[in-house]
Amino acid sequence: MRFFSLFTFLVAFIAAALAAPVEIGEDLFALRPTGAKRDIILMMPVCFEGEKLNKDQTKCIKA
């Protein structure tokens, strides 16, 4: 009985997410508030003291 209710909840959750408009569905699965700012996050290395980023900003080099 417990499995059936959990399964029903899961099916209802997926159906609601698929039936929602695209923006709401994206926000639901991204776990961010609706209307949140969508920025591209760039993964830049963090350099130690005495180092700096190279021209491509992909590696740390000694200054």
Swiss-Prot record:
Signal peptide range in chain numbering: 1-19
Propeptide residue interval(s): 20-42
Keyword line: Disulfide bond, Secreted, Signal
GO CC terms in record: extracellular region
Entry protein name: U-reduvitoxin-Pr9a
Tissues expressing the protein: Expressed by the venom gland.
Disulfide bonds: C47-C60
Compartment list: Secreted
